[in-house]
């Protein structure tokens, strides 16, 4: 296995639908080959989550876009929405690839944990026809479900969560916590 940090790549950026700078590493083998967009999990990073998976993609002749989800790594943002806003970021990356290369390339969306939920939520959107595959490894079903699970595991009062979660998501994060589910 080749170490991910030793592979040549290009730092690339795009803008999210709400104006944030999103960052990624582009591992380009052949501009006409399929592209895999890899989305990491909550408070993680793509190099850690895909240290083995990137090799599989590259060995199969695919190009890889290793993204930093919003509020992670080099991407801007302060709020993690558990896939609700991040799904639109996936669409921004698809549009980036289609405009830089061509909309004839085949694109796969691959995510782990929150990244898995993100790519599943993105699949609800009106994606271009060149998105051919979505793979979600151990996603959660919804933002509310995962937050409730963590709240219970940490013995926090669940009644307060049900009251404050929707309000704080809207006021602090600008999103509806129930807007989408994987």
Features from the language model and the residues they span:
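Alpha/beta-hydrolase fold nucleophile elbow
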Residues: 101-113
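Conserved alpha/beta-hydrolase
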Residues: 57-76
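Serine-hydrolase catalytic core
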Residues: 6, 12-16, 25, 169-182
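Hydrolase active-site cap/lid region
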Residues: 121-179
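Alpha/beta-hydrolase active-site loop
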Residues: 80-101
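The serine-hydrolase catalytic nucleophile loop
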Residues: 42-56, 69
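Glycine-rich nucleophile elbow surrounding the catalytic serine of serine-hydrolase chemistry
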Residues: 111-121
């Amino acid at each position: 296995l080749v170490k991910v940090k030793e592979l040549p790549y290009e730092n690339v950026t795009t803008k999210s639908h709400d104006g944030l700078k999103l960052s990624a590493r582009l591992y380009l083998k052949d501009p006409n080959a399929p592209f895999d967009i890899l989305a990491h999990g909550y408070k993680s990073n793509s190099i850690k989550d895909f240290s083995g998976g990137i090799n599989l993609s590259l060995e199969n002749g695919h190009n890889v876009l290793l993204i930093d989800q919003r509020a992670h790594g080099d991407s801007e943002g302060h709020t993690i929405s558990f896939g609700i806003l991040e799904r639109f970021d996936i669409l921004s990356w698809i549009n980036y690839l289609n405009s830089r290369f061509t909309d004839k390339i085949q694109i796969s969306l691959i995510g782990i944990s929150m990244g898995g939920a993100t790519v599943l939520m993105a699949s609800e959107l009106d994606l271009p026809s060149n998105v051919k595959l979505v793979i979600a490894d151990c996603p959660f079903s919804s933002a509310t479900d995962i937050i409730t699970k963590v709240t219970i595991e940490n013995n926090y009062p669940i009644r307060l969560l049900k009251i404050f979660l929707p309000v704080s998501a809207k006021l602090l994060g600008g999103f509806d916590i129930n807007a989408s589910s994987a």
